[in-house]
Amino acid sequence: VNSAGPSGGEANGTDATAAPDATAAPTATADAGAGAKAPTIAAVLPGGGARGAYEVGALSELLPALEARGERVSVWCGTSVGAINAVAFGSRAHLSAGEQTELARALWLSMRKHDVIARIVGIGGVRTMARAVGNIVGTPGAGVASLLDPSPLAASLDRWIDWDRLDANVQARLVQACVIATSLTSGEPFAFVASADGPPRLYDDEVRYVGTRLSGEHVRASAAIPVLFPAVEVTHPRRAAGYYADGGTRLNSPIKPALNLGADRVIVIGLEPFSFGGGRPASPRGPSIADVAANMLDGMLVDQVAQDVRRMALVNSFFVEDVATGTLHSPRSYRLSRGHDPYRPISYALVSPRRHGEIGRIAQQVFQRRYGGFGSLRDIDYTVISRILGSSSQSRGELLSFLMFDQEFVAELIELGRRDAQRWLRRHPRFWCRDASHDLNVGDVDRGVLKEQDALEEFRQRRR
């Protein structure tokens, strides 16, 4: 149960079955009129390596449209590459929406692979690969924890992000920023929160909130995809010191931190469609290493976001009801009868590609144009990665899209994000929506559907 509201009923278990977590929050102003405070708007940005360019493209359309309505994003929550985008936008919260998005676009178009990972083909890269294989087969003294070396990212983040400006914007209450990473000591997701009010003061059995001044180590920890990149040591604050990996590995409800930071409305950028159905076509042969790896990465970085969006939409369908026709047994009447504020639906804006695997197809096309044939001389690393993944693999493009920090690929993703955001704005002239069936192909739901959601969540918690 999300206990982002001011009352503490959910935290002490008095109303533990009122709603699934991360989907709705009790509020004293649920039915407020003209005197209500301005809504707090959050952006939730998932992980995906070079796919983060898509997020920038979508935001380049959404943020100016939001500003034209007199609204701005004041809560940025990110995981993995979404954490990089979150702190980048947070550090520019003092600028106009147009300036923010133009700087973000310029940053992404300037990124290169060597800004993020060390060369694969070369003495250092061969040594890293050899030590990784040694670890797998149990060679004594192998001593490496990843296939790739992301050491260049530390210096790059300090070039890309003005950490002092981010902190100044936080202290001026222009923005709250939240970076998610997974503790390798406890297995829990940690939300490193930069907020003038400190972290959320509530009980949460899924996410631990830690107030801090954000720095490169928090972002690198959030982006440490297991196996690909090594775990990152976080040294501050001391009470949360330890080694961390990618924040998407254990976070079942990516939207939840944004709501617990006070968000009334959320923008969620997805890297695969949010709607039900679709997916990769079945392969007539057995799965390749690329197929397996792509499914693993989707499970960590994509599926949880889509599931949480669907859960939010289902709960919106359940809790949006006509006050005049509500019955004694309705969720609204039930909560009021227990002395709690009524739940409210969460308005949202959702942007994602129209088709499953669209970003992977673009990566494959760009790779063929840029690095096929004699083009392999541009960057032999991409050719080596492609050979390892297999030239006939349907999932090769999916995996390349995580690592292809190529200007042409980045430009195409920015443009795709722009088009998909424009599509959302055409369908939603008032920007926000809360109709599940309209956006996710979800029909009307009843209590039985939500009971199944609760049972699934209970199973998840027991399994953890």
Q: Which residues does each PLM region occupy?
A:
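Active-site periphery "cap/insert" segments of enzyme catalytic domains
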Residues: 144-181, 188-192
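Helix-centered, glycine/charged polyanion-binding patches within enzymatic domains
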Residues: 268-314, 347-349, 359-361, 366-377
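C-terminal helical/tail subdomains of lipid-metabolizing enzymes
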Residues: 144, 157, 324-464
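Active-site gating loop/helix substructures
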Residues: 171-301, 386, 395-402
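Intrinsically disordered, low-complexity terminal tails and inter-domain linkers enriched
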Residues: 3-36
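Patatin-like phospholipase
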Residues: 36-44, 49-151, 157, 193-208, ...
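Alpha-helical membrane-targeting segments
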Residues: 116-148, 293-304, 308, 367-403
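C-terminal amphipathic alpha-helical segment
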Residues: 297-337
